[in-house]
Amino acid sequence: MRYSQYFIPTVKETPSDAEVISHKLMLRAGMIRKLAAGIYNYLPFGLRSIRKVEAIVREEMNRAGAIELLMPAVQPAELWKESGRWEFYGKELLRFNDRKDAEFCMGPTHEEVITDLIRKEVRSYRQLPINLYQIQGKFRDEIRPRFGLMRGREFIMKDAYSFDVNEAGADVSYEKMYKAYRRIFERCGLKFRAVEADTGTIGGSYSHEFMVLADSGEDAIVSCSACEYAANMEKAETRKGEGIEHADPRPMEHVSTPGQKSIEDVATFLGVQNTQVVKTLVLVADGEPVVALIRGDYDLNEIKLKNHLGCAELEMAEDDVVVKVTGAPTGYAGPVGLAAKVKVVADLSLEGMHNFVTGANAADTHLKNVNIGRDFSVSGFVDIRNVVIGDACPRCDSGKLEIWRGIEVGHVFKLGTKYSKALKATFLDADGKEQIIFMGCYGIGVGRTVAACIEQNHDENGIIFPIPIAPFQCIISSLSAKEDEVKAASESIYQELLEAGIEVLLDDRDERPGFKFKDADLIGIPLRIVVGAKALAEGKVELKERRSGEVEVLPIAEAIAKVKAAVKEALQV
C-alpha cells in the first residue's frame, strides 16, 4: 500500500476528551474517529488491526472445533422476557418498538437468540456437542461511555456458545475455550492473566476473565504470591478474620461524638484503631432495605453482597431510607436497636470480634464495647468485602494476596442450564428421555483487544504494535522521493517485500524526513526501512525496529532478509 494513496489522518495534538493512552493514540494515529458518545468510525488503518485480531480469533475458534454463524443484532423482546433478563438487564439494554409497536432490543449479547435456535433445531443427543460462534457488532447503552474502544456503546465482539448433553461434557467444552483464549491472546502478543470472575448479568455457575495487565486498567486483579490463585476484585475471596484475640465482653456504653462521622474521625476521637470500628451500611435490595456490617478498614464488595442476597438490583440507600431504618442521620447508623426490622449481614472479618465501636442510631453518638449475639443478631457471617494487599490467600497457607490493574478482553462462562431451562432447550438421550442441554458462553472484545494492546505497547512517540496485529508489518520511508535513484530503490524493496507476503506501507509522500519519521513512530509499524540518498550510494538502507529503537545500516538484500525473518518468527503458531 502506498501512503500517498491511503487514508491515515494523523494529528499532532492530543484530543481534549481522550483520557487514556489508547484512546489518545488511536485518535492521533488515524485509527478511529468519534461519531457520538461511545460510537466510533473504524478508519482503514484501525480496521486493519481489528481484522488481524479477528483472523487470529477465527483460526483458534476453528481449531477448537467451533463453527461460525451470524445472528441478527436486533432481537425480539419475548425471548428476553422468556429468559427473565428483560427487566434484570436494566437500562444498558437498548429497547425500542417497531411500527407495529412490537418490542425489540439491540443485542448486547446473544444467549437468548442462540438458545432459541438450538431448541428449534436440536432434537437428539447425536447432534451434540456443538459450539457456534460469531464476530459481530453489538450495542450496550453504557451510562458513561469513556476511554474510546475500551468502554464504548457500540463494539465488535466474538461470542461463542457451546451445547452439551451433560455437565461433564460442558466442562470439556469450557476447557477447550479456555485454552483457545490463552492461545489467542498469546498470539496477539499480549501480557495477560486468566482470573476467576463473577458471572454478572450473563449468569451461570463459573467464569474466568482474561485480563491484559496495564496500569491504566479499570479492573483490579488479585493474585497469590505463592500459588496460582487469581481472581478479579469482584470475585476474590477472603478468609475468616485472622489475628482476633479473644476478650471478655465489656459493658456497652454510649459516648458523645459531636461532628464525628467518618471512620477515621471516630477512631481518632475515641483513641482506637479503625480496625475496632464497624461500619453499618444501609442498602436497598430489590426495593427492600438491608444492613451490611463491615470492619472500618475494609470496603464493601457490593457484587458479593448482591450474590449472597440473590437480588436483581442493589444500591446504597438514600438518606431518608437510612433515617427510616436506623432513626439516625447518615454517619451515626449502628446495628443495635434498629428502628425497622431488616436483614443484617455481617462480613467474615467480624466473626469472633469483641468490644467494637458502632454508631448509636442517634446524632453525634456512638456505642463502645458492642458485641454480636449479646447486643444484636445477624443473619450470618459472609464474605462481603474487597480483599486488600497482604490478605492471606484463600487457597494456600503460605501466600499473600497482591493487587494489579488490568483490562478485561475476554470472558468465559459455564452457564449450566440457566438459559436452556428457561427457554426449554432439550434433547432426547439414548433412552429416548427428554433432557436439558448444558451450555457455556465465551466472549472476546475485538476492538477492546486492540485498545488494550496499545495500553500495553506504547512509548512517548506513539504506538508499538506487535507484529501479529500490526496494521502493516513494515514501513518504507522513502527520503528525497523525487530523486530517481531513491524512488527506484524504494519501489524495488516495496515490490520484493510484497512478493514475499510482507504487509508493507510505502511512505512515498512529498514530506520532510522528520515529518515521515514522526508519523512512522506514531502509527507504530514494527519495522522501518529508510531509503536515503547517502546510504543508498553505498548500496545500503537503514533498518529500525520500533520496539527497541535499534538502528542498523545494512545492504539492501540483508535488510529485506531481516524483515522477512522477523515477520516469519513473529507469526509462527
UniProtKB/Swiss-Prot annotation:
Enzyme class (EC, first level): ligase
Chief place of localization: cytoplasm
Keyword Cytoplasm among UniProt keywords: yes
Gene3D superfamilies xrefs: Anticodon-binding domain (3.40.50.800), Bira Bifunctional Protein, Domain 2 (3.30.930.10), YbaK/aminoacyl-tRNA synthetase-associated domain (3.90.960.10)
Keyword terms of this UniProt record: Aminoacyl-tRNA synthetase, ATP-binding, Cytoplasm, Ligase, Nucleotide-binding, Protein biosynthesis
Protein biosynthesis found in the keyword field: yes
Enzyme Commission number(s): 6.1.1.15
PROSITE patterns for the chain: AA_TRNA_LIGASE_II
CDD domains: ProRS-INS, ProRS_anticodon_short, ProRS_core_prok
GO biological process: one example: prolyl-tRNA aminoacylation
Lineage top rank: taxon: Bacteria
Cystine bridges: none
Subunit structure: Homodimer.
Domain-level remarks: Consists of three domains: the N-terminal catalytic domain, the editing domain and the C-terminal anticodon-binding domain.
Family as reported in the entry's similarity comment: Belongs to the class-II aminoacyl-tRNA synthetase family. ProS type 1 subfamily.
Annotated function: Catalyzes the attachment of proline to tRNA(Pro) in a two-step reaction: proline is first activated by ATP to form Pro-AMP and then transferred to the acceptor end of tRNA(Pro). As ProRS can inadvertently accommodate and process non-cognate amino acids such as alanine and cysteine, to avoid such errors it has two additional distinct editing activities against alanine. One activity is designated as 'pretransfer' editing and involves the tRNA(Pro)-independent hydrolysis of activated Ala-AMP.
Full protein name: Proline--tRNA ligase
